[in-house]
Amino acid sequence: MSQEIFLKQRKDEQLGQYSALEIACYITNYCNKKDYNITHLRLEKILYFIQLYYVKEIGSILFWEDIEAWSFGPIIPEVYRQFRQYCSFLIDPIEEYWDLSEGLWKEKKKKYISCINQKDKNNINKVVDMCEKYSTTELISISRNQTPWIKAYRRNMIRKIPISYLQEFCNNI
């Protein structure tokens, strides 16, 4: 199944942050290279655990988009919208994308080359490799049993998981 990815590929140099979609594309390619199964639901959980890792170990966040508490765990809506068409199928490597950095009407198809620096790639790889030890169902269960999701989740509502919930959780583990 081929996926059309729309991406404003950039890094916020001052904050050292990336878009969640940039991180998602990198994870997808890393998983394909390592022969790890990657579905969109698994990708969402991995992104959540990477953000937790950065809050705990680095003291900052890796991507600036909000994480929301959905019934099946933490979700980044921008990533969900791009990858949901895969349903429970494996995501193919991301080889090209539609560059929207100059606006919607000036998009160009470009070869995907990650803008993530090597230090961040190493940290991301570490978390992805740790997550590989667990099934997607287990990752969902783990994330739903952590206080950030528990505090934010309300049935039949979509609510943001504030970074302060992640910080509070990380300070207590």
Predicted regions and their residues:
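Domain-edge interaction signal
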Residues: 1-173
